[in-house]
Amino acid sequence: MRAIIIGIGQCGGKIADIFSLVDFEAIAINTSRGDLEYLKHIPQDKRILIGESIVGGKGVNANPVLGREAMKRDLPMVMKKINSMVGYEDVDIFFLTFGFGGGTGAGGTPVLAEALKEEYPDSLVVAIGALPLKEEGIRPTINAAITIDKLSKVVDSIIAIDNNKLKESDEDISQAYERINYTIVERIASLLALIDVPGEQTLDASDLKFVLRAMGSFATVGYAKADAEKVKSLSRLIIRSFENEGLYLDVSLESALYGLVAIHGPPEVLKAKDIFEALNELTQRIRGKQIFRGFYPDPRERSVEVVTLLSGIYESKSIEDIILTAKKYAREFMKAKEEGEAKKRELLSGLPDFDDVYSGEESEG
């Protein structure tokens, strides 16, 4: 299976950079020259500066309108670089990594996603977006809500990562984001690494594409891992991967249409009874009742790893909270703006023009 990672903006570029570290094809797009220079693993010729004529390489200061315009203006250059990267070999999935709360990512990702769908109709376009932390304030929340709306109309799936679930209580924001970015890559890379790999029951690219072709709805990744010697109940470990503690987004499991589960570990631990017991529970709980599964016994392994992908999700408390907060703020902002404009008009009404005050006076000198 061939996947290309495209990082848009600061957050997306950092995530794509980690994907590049673990040997994925990756490219970074940004309005900030400094952010592109900060990257460590993506080759220089795979770093694209956009919007230079608009912001001069200094970024868009979390303004998605500028991010959108930068992507639109330089879209031919971006697509030319991507086309060169694709070459003559088909791409199964384009993963667009970005931060929902930023400017370049939030504004530019929907523009690029639409262009990719038109240029590569047989490839999936999947957004991987990090939801803003609550500590970041209202502006990132507004950006996230609007971007969710726009992306849902153009991508196949949105894998949303709720940073509030992954952040540890004693971390500051910068520490949290660095660890979260590595966590995102580790989990998704673990899943992709098992596609088209021989196993007792295998997952292939068509399985993954079927699950992710979900009409712009949400998807989430679940994960559970334990030392093989400490696994007393394999079924419980598998169930943990798709329950709230293992998922990256607060979702209603019952609203999911599709599921995909990959299990990797020593053969003596991967007992069929435990596996099917857990998968039967997942099948009963999700609305779509369709589960794709892969079992990968490996005598070299000393741990058991379970990666779960749920898609076709339309109910998520994480998403609902962001959208409701954004709507509330938008109403309050528009009301305050209208009241302010009304007070300004009232205050300034009745003032004369210069011509009224100075009419008839002769100029001196």
Curated annotation (Swiss-Prot):
PANTHER family, sorted: CELL DIVISION PROTEIN FTSZ-RELATED (PTHR30314), TUBULIN-LIKE PROTEIN CETZ (PTHR30314:SF10)
Source species of the chain: Pyrococcus abyssi (strain GE5 / Orsay)
One GO biological process term: regulation of cell shape
Primary role: Involved in cell shape control.
Keyword tags: Cell shape, Cytoplasm, GTP-binding, Nucleotide-binding
Keyword Nucleotide-binding tagged: yes
Listed SUPFAM superfamilies: Tubulin nucleotide-binding domain-like
Gene3D superfamilies linked to this entry: Tubulin/FtsZ, GTPase domain (3.40.50.1440)
Pfam families: CetZ_C, Tubulin
Cellular compartment(s): Cytoplasm
Keyword field contains GTP-binding: yes
Binding site for GTP: 10-14, 103-105, 136, 163, 181
Protein name: Tubulin-like protein CetZ
Entry's Gene Ontology cellular component terms: cell division site; cytoplasm; microtubule
Entry similarity comment: Belongs to the CetZ family.
InterPro entries with a match to the protein in the record: CetZ, CetZ_C, FtsZ/CetZ, Tubulin/FtsZ_GTPase_sf, Tubulin_CS, Tubulin_FtsZ_GTPase
GO molecular function annotation: GTP binding; GTPase activity
